[in-house]
Amino acid sequence: MAKWQELQSSNLRRCSYDIETGMLQIQFNSGKTYTYQEVPASVYNGLLEASSPGQFFNQNIKGVYE
């Protein structure tokens, strides 16, 4: 099980990433958790390093990965 990383965001609470499978899980502040498949490590790292994780999610993950 991948370790959860807290996010500083008004919409996103935390995320976890499995580098072997490319599975990214994002938990929203609402409590809902969504899973995205085949996400490159570079996208996960971008999410962690983004000054606005919510904006990064909307531009680079939402609608791009299932």
Tell where the protein language model's regions lie, with residue ranges.
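Acidic/histidine-enriched, beta-strand-rich ligand/metal-binding domains
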Residues: 2-66
